[in-house]
């Protein structure tokens, strides 16, 4: 390896040790008889100090030629110094330029010069070098790891369902068509139908962390056309409460893990995460409309909640909460109904965002066919899905959790694009 340590490994306790470091030139300061280079890698920044009398002439003379963001390799000696950042510096004996950067940068990775979001996304690779994006994506890694650990401990099996499908998952029109030889095909909106088929296959508990694609024309701070969804499905449930408990306990676990493992990253983002207490509060859809009406926002029965309503609910409820018993007309055909008006469906809300949706599913073949027809769809279009219900389908339910929206609540990002490496929205297909 070209390096044997990260910058974070360089501590005063290693005074006198030889190290090999590699990273990016963050800053260069030339004071004549002494020169400084700030070397950055994914763990932080360390100061390279070059007194003219203590380093080789070749190394000393190389510093003024270094351009910001060039990639360099350094061999030197750790030296404790209370005046240096972090109380430590490295005295280089050798500096090797591995890759020289252009002097004209489309944005400043040090963050000293502000840039708008579009500029940052256009130069995303440089933008991702900044401290805040680095913190966000380290947190994202901890979040997905925590999700997997939580679900695996509870007997869930990770699966990967098709992303090229022949028909709409939910009968909607928000589909991206793809060229698939001589047939029509689409990108999957969700793994929903396949999760249910796996319940019939006897898997009992499955989860997937994977992409979903929705051809929505929304161009807001909370919408993407390609996103990552965390989905589960579980068999032999008594009611939707069984899957709601898994969801609330998972979210509390994720927040706890991020607090424990991402102290430095949260500090970089100026965030303090609360300890989520379970169970979360539950209010029905009808109660939600009444509450909104009390605050001057009128929503007709059977309508989805507009953004204004979600924001107001985020002001009323400081903690995550569930909205339950959604009207039948607002939910897909596979949702189990409680009566002629409402269903077992629920949404998880937090900070004015809908984070997750779920329900107990309809497992009875004849009822499912009827509900497909009632929504103006053809059972023939779902024949392979329906086939699974003919040979013994257990009562089951599940949910889908938006990973990016969850990360918005954790990191404080105001725009969903901030928590996505290379976002895809209505106007952005590059980089």
Swiss-Prot record:
Mg(2+) 2 binds at residues 354, 357. GO terms for molecular function: aspartate-tRNA ligase activity; aspartate-tRNA(Asn) ligase activity; ATP binding; magnesium ion binding; RNA binding. It is an enzyme of class 6 (ligase). InterPro entries: Aa-tRNA-synt_II, aa-tRNA-synth_II, aa-tRNA-synth_II/BPL/LPL, Asp-tRNA_synthase_2, Asp/Asn-tRNA-synth_IIb, NA-bd_OB-fold, NA-bd_OB_tRNA. Keywords: Aminoacyl-tRNA synthetase, ATP-binding, Cytoplasm, Ligase, Magnesium, Metal-binding, Nucleotide-binding, Protein biosynthesis. Residues 192-195 are annotated as: Aspartate. Binds 3 Mg(2+) cations per subunit. The strongest magnesium site (Mg1) is bound to the beta- and gamma-phosphates of ATP and four water molecules complete its coordination sphere. L-aspartate binds at residues 170, 214, 357, 361. The record marks 85 as: Important for tRNA non-discrimination. Aspartyl-tRNA synthetase with relaxed tRNA specificity since it is able to aspartylate not only its cognate tRNA(Asp) but also tRNA(Asn). Reaction proceeds in two steps: L-aspartate is first activated by ATP to form Asp-AMP and then transferred to the acceptor end of tRNA(Asp/Asn). This is Aspartate--tRNA(Asp/Asn) ligase. It comes from Methanopyrus kandleri (strain AV19 / DSM 6324 / JCM 9639 / NBRC 100938).
């Amino acid at each position: 390896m070209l390096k044997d340590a990260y910058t974070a490994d360089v501590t005063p306790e290693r005074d006198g040790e030889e190290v090999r470091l590699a990273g990016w030139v963050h800053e260069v300061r030339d004071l004549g008889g002494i020169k400084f280079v700030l070397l950055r890698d994914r763990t932080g920044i360390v100061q390279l100090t070059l007194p003219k009398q203590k380093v080789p002439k070749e190394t000393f003379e190389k510093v003024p030629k270094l351009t910001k963001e060039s990639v360099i390799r350094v061999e030197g000696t750790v030296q404790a110094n209370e005046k240096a950042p972090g109380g430590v510096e490295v005295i280089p004996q050798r500096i090797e330029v591995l890759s020289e950067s252009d002097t004209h940068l489309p944005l400043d990775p040090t963050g000293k010069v502000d840039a708008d979001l579009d500029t940052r996304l256009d130069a995303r690779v440089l933008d991702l070098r900044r401290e805040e994006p680095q913190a966000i994506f380290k947190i994202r890694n901890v979040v997905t790891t925590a999700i997997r650990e939580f679900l695996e401990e509870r007997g869930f099996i990770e699966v990967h369902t098709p992303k090229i499908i022949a028909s709409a998952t939910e009968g909607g029109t928000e589909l991206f068509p793809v060229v698939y030889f001589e047939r029509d095909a689409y990108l999957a909106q969700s793994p929903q139908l396949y999760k249910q088929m796996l319940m019939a296959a006897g898997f009992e508990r499955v989860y997937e962390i994977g992409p979903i694609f929705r051809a929505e024309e929304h161009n807001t701070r909370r919408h993407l056309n390609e996103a990552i969804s965390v989905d589960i499905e579980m068999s032999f449930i008594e009611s939707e409460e069984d899957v709601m408990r898994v969801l609330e306990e998972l979210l509390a676990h994720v927040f706890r893990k991020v607090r424990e493992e991402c102290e430095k990253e949260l500090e970089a983002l100026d965030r303090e995460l609360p300890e989520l207490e379970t169970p979360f509060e539950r209010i029905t859809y009808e109660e939600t409309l009444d509450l909104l009406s009390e605050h001057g926002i009128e929503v007709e029965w059977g309508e989805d909640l507009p953004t204004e309503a979600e924001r107001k609910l985020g002001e009323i409820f400081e903690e995550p909460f569930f909205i339950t018993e959604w009207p039948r007309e607002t939910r897909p055909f596979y949702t189990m109904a409680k009566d002629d008006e409402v269903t077992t469906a629920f949404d998880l809300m937090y900070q004015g965002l809908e984070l997750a949706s779920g329900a107990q599913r309809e497992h009875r073949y004849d009822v499912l066919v009827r509900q497909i027809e009632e929504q103006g769809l053809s059972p023939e279009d779902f024949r392979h899905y329906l086939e699974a219900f003919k040979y013994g389908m257990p009562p089951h339910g599940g949910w889908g959790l938006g990973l990016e929206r969850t990360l918005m609540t954790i990191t404080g990002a105001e725009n969903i694009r901030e928590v996505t490496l290379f976002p895809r929205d209505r106007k952005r297909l590059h980089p």
